[in-house]
C-alpha cells in the first residue's frame, strides 16, 4: 500500500499514528505529495489533490482519513477505530466530531499561515486560533 501525505496535514498525521499503532510501517509506503501546484503529477494519482490518500494493494484509492483508518483496522483485524456500542457510542461519536472540527480548523490555520504574509487573511487566522 502507498499513503500520500503532506508534512503538515493533521489528517495524514492521524493515519501515520494509526499505522505505527498497528505496527504495519513495513506494509505502507509513505510518500510526500506535492499539492496546490499547477500541473502536479499528484493530480494524476488523485484528481482532487487532497491528502491523505491511500492506494490499496488491489489498486483502489481511498480518500478521507476516517475511511482510511476504518479500512486499515478492518484489514489488520484491529478495533482501534471502532466506536463502542451501547450507551457510550453517542458520546464517543460526539467527541469524534469535536476532534474532527478541531482538525478542520487546524488545517485552515496551517494553510493560511503558510501563505506569503501579504496574501494571508488575518481574519481567518484570528478565527482559527
Regions found by a protein language model. Name each.
Residues 123-129:
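Amphipathic alpha-helical packing segments from all-alpha helical-bundle domains
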Amino acid at each position: 500500500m502507498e499513503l500520500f501525505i503532506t508534512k503538515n496535514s493533521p489528517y495524514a498525521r492521524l493515519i501515520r499514528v494509526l499505522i505505527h499503532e498497528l505496527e504495519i510501517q513495513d506494509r505502507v509506503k509513505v510518500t510526500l505529495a506535492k499539492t496546490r501546484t499547477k500541473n502536479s503529477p499528484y493530480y494524476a494519482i488523485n484528481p482532487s489533490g487532497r491528502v491523505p490518500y491511500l492506494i490499496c494493494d488491489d489498486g483502489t484509492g481511498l480518500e478521507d482519513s476516517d475511511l482510511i483508518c476504518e479500512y486499515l483496522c478492518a484489514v489488520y483485524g484491529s478495533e482501534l477505530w471502532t466506536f463502542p456500542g451501547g450507551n457510550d457510542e453517542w458520546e464517543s461519536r460526539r467527541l469524534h466530531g469535536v476532534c474532527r472540527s478541531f482538525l478542520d480548523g487546524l488545517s485552515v490555520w496551517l494553510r493560511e499561515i503558510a501563505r506569503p504574509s501579504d496574501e494571508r487573511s488575518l481574519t481567518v487566522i484570528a478565527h482559527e486560533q
